[in-house]
């Protein structure tokens, strides 16, 4: 399996890159697409400083987990102060995982989900441990759906991918 994690300032640039890859490369033509997820960066509701790692210009990490999710029906009509407190608790639960970088993107009306998340870290264990810890926050009660999960190691040399293909 291969996951491609692309980002650009303009969505049309992503569409062009995807279409060019699928149409003009042998590798792209050979792949069977399983899933495509799309998100846009929008300012966070309560923390305008919460920016995706890729927007902050951070170097990509060695491991990534990407997944979509949708909040519960009552999340958006909940008292804003209560929602803010839940998000503060959620963020504080991640305090020991500063090396795990979050990329949170809005996906409303772009597919079947409301949000797209991508966590990057130096090791896969760090992502897994963080995701486990986040299960103990009250905000977790307000997640309706969060499947599928895709995880993988960053590969910078296409030869490495070709070497392991069946």
What are these regions (language model features)?
Residues 1-3, 98-103, 113, 135-138, ...:
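A cross-kingdom feature marking solvent-exposed beta-strand/loop segments within repeated
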Residues 1-24:
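Extended cationic-aromatic binding surfaces that line active-site or macromolecule-binding grooves
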Residues 9-14, 32-96, 108-112, 122-132, ...:
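Short S/T/G/P-rich N-terminal loop/turn motif that feeds into the first structured element of a domain
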Residues 22-30, 134-143:
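A common structural junction motif
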Residues 22-24, 52-55, 103-105:
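Catalytic micro-motifs at enzyme active sites that drive phosphoryl/nucleotidyl and oxygen chemistry
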Residues 25, 90, 94-98, 138:
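Short, well-ordered alpha-helical segments in soluble proteins
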């Amino acid at each position: 399996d291969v996951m491609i994690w692309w980002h650009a300032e303009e969505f049309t640039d992503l569409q062009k890159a995807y279409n060019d890859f699928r149409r003009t490369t042998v590798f792209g033509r050979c792949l069977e697409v399983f899933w495509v997820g799309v998100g846009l960066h929008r300012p966070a509701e309560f923390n305008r400083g919460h920016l995706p790692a890729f927007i902050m210009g951070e170097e990509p990490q060695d491991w990534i987990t990407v997944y979509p999710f949708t909040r519960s029906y009552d999340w958006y009509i909940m008292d804003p102060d209560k929602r803010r407190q839940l998000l503060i608790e959620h963020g504080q639960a991640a305090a020991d995982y500063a090396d795990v970088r979050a990329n949170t993107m809005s996906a409303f009306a772009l597919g079947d989900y409301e949000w797209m998340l991508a966590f990057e870290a130096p090791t896969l264990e760090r992502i897994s441990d963080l995701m486990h810890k986040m299960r103990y926050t009250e905000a977790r009660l307000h997640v309706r759906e969060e499947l599928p999960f895709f995880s993988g190691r960053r590969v910078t040399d296409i030869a490495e991918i070709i070497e392991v293909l069946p």
